[in-house]
Amino acid sequence: MAPQNLGTLCLLLLYLLGAAIAGRDFYKILGVPRSASIKDIKKAYRKLALQLHPDRNPDDPRAQEKFQDLGAAYEVLSDSEKRKQYDTYGEEGLKDGHQSSHGDIFSHFFGDFGFMFGGTPRQQDRNIPRGSDIIVDLEVTLEEVYAGNFVEVVRNKPVARQAPGKRKCNCRQEMRTTQLGPGRFQMTQEVVCDECPNVKLVNEERTLEVEIEPGVRDGMEYPFIGEGEPHVDGEPGDLRFRIKVVKHPIFERRGDDLYTNVTISLVESLVGFDMDITHLDGHKVHISRDKITRPGAKLWKKGEGLPNFDNNNIKGSLIITFDVDFPKEQLTEEAREGIKQLLNQGSVQKVYNGLQGY
């Protein structure tokens, strides 16, 4: 073999060896930069988990492998210690670590029975009893509505587990058809299972990740399939988190628009002013006025409202209403005369219907 070809082969072998030692690129699998925050990592996992779940890709022979890689990437990068080890030593430095079930990770975001990929509620077999659904109000701040967030909910969930012995049950009932004569049939419902393995309800701690999506609306619900009340003879109900946006001391939400009031002095209302409003994510909204601002005047800042839930690239407006703080001390006669001369404005005393048109 020529020396040049031998050198190329050695370089290729070294590259392959280095790649094998380095292992999988978890950042690339999740599609996030190495500087990604934990919120970015959770958001990326949740989005990709829906796309790559094997049940949604039955024709892809690598679907299970892709889903497992995604779960492994999330398990490492969502844990600060594992992430630090991975950043320093690569995947090889994690070989001795405990690995979680990727199905368990998925259930933290979507529930025990996964996600209904057809976009429709799970089909219910009427012959299978089902536990009650649970609806829990989840309070979120306007800051979370603006920027999005992941809320970790830890709950004690009653779960049916096997116990010694047998029990009577109604878990399986079938319709039996008996022919009574020509053209005559009788249908009866019969229990076809006389005894089942005994079960008992035990409390298990469950950690669920609820994604508060930007622009989420008050009253919207996030379902977790199979996380509701258990049923010893059937399947558990669902758990639904209902969004309840708490009142904000500065901003009021109306659709995708935000409303707020700003109080300025009488001097500022006459000669103008500059100021900044701190927005929900901390950025500053600058206001500059070089003309008279009347009490009740409104200023619209387009694109400074909340993100639209269906399209986060579209944002509403910030509507600012100005209040004027008049001096509380009485003016001297000299001051009054000075103001009259300065403004040079005559008397305007007009009486009219200010609510006309309503």
Swiss-Prot record:
Subcellular location: Endoplasmic reticulum lumen
Quaternary structure and interacting proteins, as annotated: Part of a large chaperone multiprotein complex comprising DNAJB11, HSP90B1, HSPA5, HYOU, PDIA2, PDIA4, PDIA6, PPIB, SDF2L1, UGGT1 and very small amounts of ERP29, but not, or at very low levels, CALR nor CANX. Binds to denatured substrates in an ATP-independent manner. Interacts via the J domain with HSPA5 in an ATP-dependent manner.
Domain J intervals: 25-90
Signal peptide (from-to): 1-22
Organ and tissue specificity: Pancreas.
Domain of life: Eukaryota
Keywords on record: Chaperone, Disulfide bond, Endoplasmic reticulum, Glycoprotein, Phosphoprotein, Signal
Protein name: DnaJ homolog subfamily B member 11
GO BP of this protein: protein folding; protein maturation
Carbohydrate attachment residues: 261
Positions of post-translational Phosphothreonine modification: 188
GO cellular component: endoplasmic reticulum lumen
Protein role: As a co-chaperone for HSPA5 it is required for proper folding, trafficking or degradation of proteins. Binds directly to both unfolded proteins that are substrates for ERAD and nascent unfolded peptide chains, but dissociates from the HSPA5-unfolded protein complex before folding is completed. May help recruiting HSPA5 and other chaperones to the substrate. Stimulates HSPA5 ATPase activity. It is necessary for maturation and correct trafficking of PKD1.
InterPro entries to which the protein is assigned, alphabetical: DnaJ-B11-like, DnaJ_C, DnaJ_domain, DnaJ_domain_CS, HSP40/DnaJ_pept-bd, J_dom_sf
PTM entry text: Contains high-mannose Endo H-sensitive carbohydrates. Cys-169, Cys-171, Cys-193 and Cys-196 form intramolecular disulfide bonds. The preferential partner for each Cys is not known.
Any one GO MF annotation of this record: unfolded protein binding
